[in-house]
Amino acid sequence: MQTATRLERMHGHLALDFTLKQQRTRLTVREHRPPLQVVRDFGLADGTSFVHLHNVAGGVLAGDQLTTTIKLAASTKAQLTTTSSTRIYRSDGEQIAYQQVQATLAEQSLLEYWPDTTIPFAESLYQQQTRIDLAADAGLCWWEFLAPGREAYGERFAYRQLRLDCDIYALGRPILLDRMRLQPSLQQLSNPLYFGKYSYLATGYICRVGWDAVQWKALEAELMAFAASQTKLGRCLWGVSCLAAHGLVIRGLSSNSRDLLATAFDYWRFAKQALYGTTPNLPRKIY
């Protein structure tokens, strides 16, 4: 019983610093407190540092407060992924499972974030806050994937509340303030105004500071054409929209998670070719 109580209130912290050494990005784990840790870090052929992030508790429990801080030095490139889905366990009271991510990208750096799906269990309460700061010519590919619950156990939108906030700043000014509040008991998420027949949600943010509005509109049109080709009513829906400056947002709804994960990478394939003239490294979870 004492162990369970202790697990319910973990204050985990992971601080990652990426620096450039001999034209390759190197990771320094400045701080780590359980349950957060780095399982593996290795270099890719183009000098990118590829990192697996792991929660040894298997998920986020009610009362947990977990913080991840990411700093990229100038001209570094990092790709982050998770070792498994993020499970949000049930709350027997009013304690919220909480995660915070803060990322700071220096000039000409590039961060790619490819997590597994977040799965909120029945009766769970979850809050996630993300803030990303971009310097001049910094680039970003950031995705979030959300499941309706444990469908194999008959859980679909059975959680109590889910809050997802994401703020992106470029050159000190906000370009995205994204707020999502899902409360199934009040919102009837199966209504067509919300998820309708679909169960899984993908949200992607693609940015590069310095591109002008004309360039972003051209990329938006290209990705919208791809979105139309991937939209299949009853199976998946996709949409793309420019931000106020320096980026765009992509959203997808699907009846399964596999379609979202694979198609998300295709969006980045188009975007990275346009933004950097290169082909992205395939996230290992899609192999």
Curated annotation (Swiss-Prot):
GO-annotated cellular components: cytoplasm
Swiss-Prot/TrEMBL keywords: Chaperone, Cytoplasm, Nickel insertion
Listed InterPro entries: UreD
GO molecular function, one term: nickel cation binding
Statement: the UniProt record of this protein carries the keyword Heme: no
Compartments reported by the entry: Cytoplasm
Main location class: cytoplasm
Pfam family, one: UreD
Top-level division of the source organism's lineage: Bacteria
Described function: Required for maturation of urease via the functional incorporation of the urease nickel metallocenter.
Similarity comment: Belongs to the UreD family.
Subunit structure: UreD, UreF and UreG form a complex that acts as a GTP-hydrolysis-dependent molecular chaperone, activating the urease apoprotein by helping to assemble the nickel containing metallocenter of UreC. The UreE protein probably delivers the nickel.
Descriptive protein name: Urease accessory protein UreD
